[in-house]
């Protein structure tokens, strides 16, 4: 067994050297034998002279192997065989790797600790960050490997925009691509040096600095901080963003606006120089907009804004936006704060507006049909009260101009109003004792009129008669519209499981109500729509108003009532061929009727 000792005086000495030397001397030594040389013969003299250079060569090789066996210096702080001097380094003791025989400072490898107990393997051996990288997840390297442009382009952080068939090599940003550590020439050379097997004790091998160096050098150990790493990362991110914007201006924005005669280059400047100037200013404004002033860091939205600006300004259909940017009509500080919808080309904006308009037209507010519960000290209690909702200001009597007089006895009031109307009947309608006064409000068209409802029938038998109760206060407020082609199949299908009350709506005898009534019927009939009314009670699921012209009865009415309601036909008024009318359909949930 051989002992690794340093041939350099300025290196630290292993504290186990004496123990190992003592152990070495106790082992039996091999005797060396020398060959006797016959000086009498000339042949032996020539052989001796020829062997002398061979011995010198062997001695040189032995010295090189001994120096290689001792190991080499390679530490994270930058120390290596070329610049290491114990008097100049104050990083403390060093430790040697059992895999590649490299010497490293203990504090540098343990992030400032004086012991390496946490880095020792199960067999009490120490391995550096190259031999066993899994032990050094806590370290942050002080130097980052340089990444080439090709690697940045293929890091897949910003994917190329394939909206044109161009073959330009765009530059894309890299926000969180892994860093590659490049080994120094000394470190690469030392890994391939063969090491001798040495018997080690359970303790670690340390390399102590000299006493003179400990007294003279008092500088603090400088380690790379997280702030330095973030600054380097942010710098690279901004550099790639500016490079990407420069390509955008030089290959797309400036040439396309010049070709369309929307922009002219300033005197003394070419496309490259003006593109670099625009790119630098745009990146500066984007950095200011995405900088978190409180923490002094760059928000993650920075990379998203770079993608959005690049893809929208590269779009050939967005020529007007490009012209506004290069001409200065759109300031860069406003450009970086525009959202994706504002940056999109006119075709996309028009499509989005049409889509939103269609969604609003088909929107129907659904009334929740779940039972209401109240939390009390006894638990959850179901609310059985079906009281009418509080009157809204939109339903005030002044706005809808109701002509009925409220009374304490509501039944008596309705009877009196029915007799009053029956004295002056309309020549084309029949008013019976079951007619209910109502007011129709259509805020979407700004139309309103007063009238009355005649009850026609119900699709299923109910526990009790609710045809008056279902209308409530008679204020019919239009909440929305939906196509007739959608509503008719729905009413036909739901009539099998739900009860549907059917009414016929007539206007009052005054000319203003009749004119407004005709406008409502024409509007719904021409557009193929039915009106959705706000439900009046908690057991009502849907409330629809269906138009009819030319004296025709809607097919859906026949499908819902069926032949068993033929006796209800006498309730219909005799309509002329040119008469307009409205039918009300109230979908009821029977389980909530008590």
From Swiss-Prot:
Note the PROSITE patterns from the entry. Answer: TFIIS_CENTRAL, ZF_PHD_1, ZF_PHD_2
Q: Which GO terms describe its cellular component?
A: nucleus
Q: Where is the composition biased (Polar residues)?
A: 1-13
Q: Does the keyword Cell cycle apply?
A: no
Compositionally biased, Basic and acidic residues: which spans? 36-63, 155-164, 209-231
User: According to the UniProt entry, which residue ranges have a biased composition of type Basic residues?
Assistant: 191-208
Q: Where in the cell is it found?
A: Nucleus
Identify the residues that the record assigns to the TFIIS central domain, covering every copy. Answer: 254-365
- Give a GO molecular function annotation for the protein: zinc ion binding
Fetch the Pfam families from UniProt: PHD (PF00628), SPOC (PF07744), TFIIS_M (PF07500)
Q: Phosphoserine modification sites?
A: 177
Q: Where is this region: Disordered?
A: 1-65, 142-231
Phosphoprotein: present as a keyword of the record? Answer: yes
Q: Specify the superkingdom.
A: Eukaryota
Output compositional bias ranges, type Acidic residues.
165-175
The alphabetical list of record keywords is:
Metal-binding, Nucleus, Phosphoprotein, Repressor, Transcription, Transcription regulation, Zinc, Zinc-finger
Which SUPFAM superfamilies did the record assign? Elongation factor TFIIS domain 2, FYVE/PHD zinc finger
The GO biological-process annotations, alphabetized, read as: DNA-templated transcription
| InterPro entries, per database record | SPOC_C, TFIIS_cen_dom, TFIIS_cen_dom_sf, Zinc_finger_PHD-type_CS, Znf_FYVE_PHD, Znf_PHD, Znf_PHD-finger, Znf_RING/FYVE/PHD
Q: Where are the zinc fingers (PHD-type)?
A: 72-134
Task: Cite the domain annotation text.
Answer: The PHD domain is involved in the binding to H3K4me3.
Q: Any idea what job this protein has?
A: Negative regulator of transcription elongation.
The family note in this entry says: Belongs to the BYE1 family.
Quaternary arrangement and interactors, per the entry? Interacts with the RNA polymerase RPB1 subunit and specifically with the trimethylated H3 histone H3K4me3.
Which protein is depicted? Transcription factor BYE1
């Amino acid at each position: 067994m051989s002992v690794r000792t340093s041939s350099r005086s300025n290196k630290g000495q292993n504290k186990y050297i004496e123990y190992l030397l003592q152990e070495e001397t106790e082992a039996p030594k091999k005797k060396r034998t020398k060959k006797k040389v016959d000086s009498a013969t000339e042949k032996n003299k020539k052989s001796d002279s020829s062997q002398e250079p061979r011995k010198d060569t062997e001695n040189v090789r032995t010295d090189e192997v001994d120096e290689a066996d001792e190991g080499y210096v390679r530490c994270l702080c930058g120390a290596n065989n070329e610049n290491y001097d114990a008097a100049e380094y104050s990083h403390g003791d060093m430790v040697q790797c059992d895999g590649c025989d490299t010497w490293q400072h203990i504090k540098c490898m343990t992030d400032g600790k004086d012991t390496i107990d946490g880095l020792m393997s199960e067999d009490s051996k120490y391995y550096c960050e190259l031999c066993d990288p899994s032990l050094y997840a806590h370290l942050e390297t002080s130097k980052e490997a340089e990444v080439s442009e090709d690697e940045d382009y293929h890091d897949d952080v910003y994917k190329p925009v394939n909206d044109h068939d161009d073959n330009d090599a765009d530059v894309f940003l890299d926000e969180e691509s892994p860093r590659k550590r490049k080994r120094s020439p000394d470190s690469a050379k030392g890994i391939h040096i063969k090491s001798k097997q040495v018997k080690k004790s359970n303790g670690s091998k340390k390399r102590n600095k000299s006493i003179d160096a400990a007294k003279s050098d008092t500088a603090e150990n400088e380690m790379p901080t997280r702030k330095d790493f973030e600054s380097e990362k942010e710098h690279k991110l901004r550099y790639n963003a500016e490079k990407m914007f420069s390509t955008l201006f030089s290959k797309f924005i400036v040439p396309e606006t010049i070709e369309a005669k929307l922009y002219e280059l300033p005197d003394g400047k070419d496309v490259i120089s003006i593109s670099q100037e625009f790119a630098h200013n745009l990146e500066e404004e984007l950095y200011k907009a995405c900088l978190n002033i409180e923490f002094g860091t760059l928000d993650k939205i920075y990379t998203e804004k770079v993608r959005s600006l690049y893809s929208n300004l590269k779009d050939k259909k967005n020529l007007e936006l490009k012209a506004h940017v290069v001409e200065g009509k759109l300031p860069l500080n406003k450009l970086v704060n525009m959202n994706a919808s504002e940056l999109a080309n006119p075709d996309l904006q028009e499509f989005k507006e049409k889509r939103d308009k269609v969604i609003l037209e088909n929107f129907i507010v659904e009334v929740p049909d779940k039972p209401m519960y109240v939390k009390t000290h006894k638990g959850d209690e179901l609310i059985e009260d079906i009281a009418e909702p509080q009157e809204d200001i939109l339903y005030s009597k002044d706005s809808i101009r109701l002509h009925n007089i409220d009374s304490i006895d509501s039944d008596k009031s309705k009877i009196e109003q029915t007799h009053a109307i029956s004295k002056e009947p309309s020549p084309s309608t029949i008013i019976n004792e079951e007619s209910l006064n109502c007011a129709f409000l259509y805020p979407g068209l700004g139309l309103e009129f007063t009238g009355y409802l005649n009850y026609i029938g119900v699709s299923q038998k109910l526990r009790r008669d609710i045809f008056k109760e279902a209308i409530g206060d008679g204020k019919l407020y239009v909440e929305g519209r939906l196509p007739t082609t959608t509503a008719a199949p729905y009413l036909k299908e739901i009539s099998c499981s739900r009860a549907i009350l059917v009414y016929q709506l007539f206007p009052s005898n005054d000319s203003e109500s009749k004119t407004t009534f005709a406008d409502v019927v024409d509007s719904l009939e021409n557009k193929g729509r039915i009106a959705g009314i706000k439900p009046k009670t908690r057991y009502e699921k849907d409330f629809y108003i269906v138009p009819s012209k030319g004296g025709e009865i809607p097919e859906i009415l026949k499908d819902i009532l069926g032949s068993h309601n033929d006796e209800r036909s006498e309730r219909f008024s005799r309509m002329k061929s040119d008469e307009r009318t409205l039918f009300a359909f109230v979908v009821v949930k029977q389980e909530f009727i008590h």
